[in-house]
Amino acid sequence: MTNIRKSHPLMKIVNNAFIDLPAPSNISSWWNFGSLLGVCLILQILTGLFLAMHYTSDTMTAFSSVTHICRDVNYGWIIRYMHANGASMFFICLYMHVGRGLYYGSYTFLETWNVGVILLFMVMATAFMGYVLPWGQMSFWGATVITNLLSAIPYIGTNLVEWIWGGFSVDKATLTRFFAFHFILPFIITALVMVHLLFLHETGSNNPTGISSDMDKIPFHPYYTIKDILGALLLILALMVLVLFTPDLLGDPDNYTPANPLNTPPHIKPEWYFLFAYAILRSIPNKLGGVLALVLSILILILMPLLHMSKQRSMMFRPLSQCLFWLLVADLLTLTWIGGQPVEHPYIIIGQLASIIYFLLILVLMPVISTIENNLLKW
């Protein structure tokens, strides 16, 4: 009699994805972030569902409904802060996951990589809309500033912005539709995650060497299930330390002031995980140019397979490329810092230089250095 795990139509899918899946024997902890993102997604959907039970998406009551959740709902405060800080953990894992893909050349799995980039855009859109829902000052002004960027699109820009707003300013209609989109998008993301995994399992995982591991595979369970569980426990530990000790560390104090269209906060800035892109946006004096740079700063990931000039897939044996990679990481951290600073003398020029370096590294320096390394291999 065959094992039900291998014969049952549903169990078979789970078995082939998480139990009997042949996995490379040498994948490091950088390969943990995929499963951690799954944990984050489940956590966000669950906490979000419980928050949605008590939240009202109306401009008059949205702010007080969030206050009500924190004060009156049983454990509402912990659910709210787990959801808010869970988003931060989500983005930490996302950026680590993308960084791993760049370092080890995982972008050569074209379908998996492209679905991943679409997922990144969708998670960013979801997080942005979620930030608007508490209807604090930064929620309102963040929504106003970011949606207004679309008015830079020639000819249709103004109509497009008013269509998204559902009126002539960010108001009740905007909040209601943002809540609807914020609720539905995670489920679309979940479906896309399955597509992402489907494409990944067509080829199998990459590994730190970038060399085919077909001759040295081990079953996913128990080796990587136990490794993923350890990773998940550490993630939850980090999240709970954040939630229970410094829940407002990553938030903006302005969001504890109810939204007021007549009073602009001195410094409008998004959540920390968007600051690098915000810095790139602000570093270009022209509105349309800034918007294009903002979109390209993420969309550039799609070009990574085209920009790969090296004969080797991974950066493991390419010290010069490694230097550039870590320079890119440092540059992104610099941009993140600049994005949170006011627009004044030293910060403007630092932001512009960091933005130029960002595009220069990816589009010019990395391919050039890869070509040089190819020539060094001949010596």
UniProtKB/Swiss-Prot annotation:
Gene3D superfamilies, per the entry: Cytochrome Bc1 Complex, Chain C
GO cellular component: mitochondrial inner membrane; respiratory chain complex III
Keyword Heme: yes
Membrane topology designation: Multi-pass membrane protein
Localization per record: Mitochondrion inner membrane
Domain of life: Eukaryota
Sites where the protein binds heme b b566: H97, H196
GO molecular function: metal ion binding; ubiquinol-cytochrome-c reductase activity
Binding site residues for a ubiquinone: H201
Gene Ontology BP, a term: mitochondrial electron transport, ubiquinol to cytochrome c
Keywords: Electron transport, Heme, Iron, Membrane, Metal-binding, Mitochondrion, Mitochondrion inner membrane, Respiratory chain, Transmembrane, Transmembrane helix, Transport, Ubiquinone
Ranges that cross the membrane: 33-53, 77-98, 113-133, 178-198, 226-246, 288-308, 320-340, 347-367
Note on how the cofactor is bound: Binds 2 heme b groups non-covalently.
Cofactor(s), names only, from the UniProt record: heme b
Family: Belongs to the cytochrome b family.
Oligomeric and partner information: The cytochrome bc1 complex contains 11 subunits: 3 respiratory subunits (MT-CYB, CYC1 and UQCRFS1), 2 core proteins (UQCRC1 and UQCRC2) and 6 low-molecular weight proteins (UQCRH/QCR6, UQCRB/QCR7, UQCRQ/QCR8, UQCR10/QCR9, UQCR11/QCR10 and a cleavage product of UQCRFS1). This cytochrome bc1 complex then forms a dimer.
Function recorded in the entry: Component of the ubiquinol-cytochrome c reductase complex (complex III or cytochrome b-c1 complex) that is part of the mitochondrial respiratory chain. The b-c1 complex mediates electron transfer from ubiquinol to cytochrome c. Contributes to the generation of a proton gradient across the mitochondrial membrane that is then used for ATP synthesis.
Note: Heme 1 (or BL or b562) is low-potential and absorbs at about 562 nm, and heme 2 (or BH or b566) is high-potential and absorbs at about 566 nm.
Protein name as catalogued: Cytochrome b
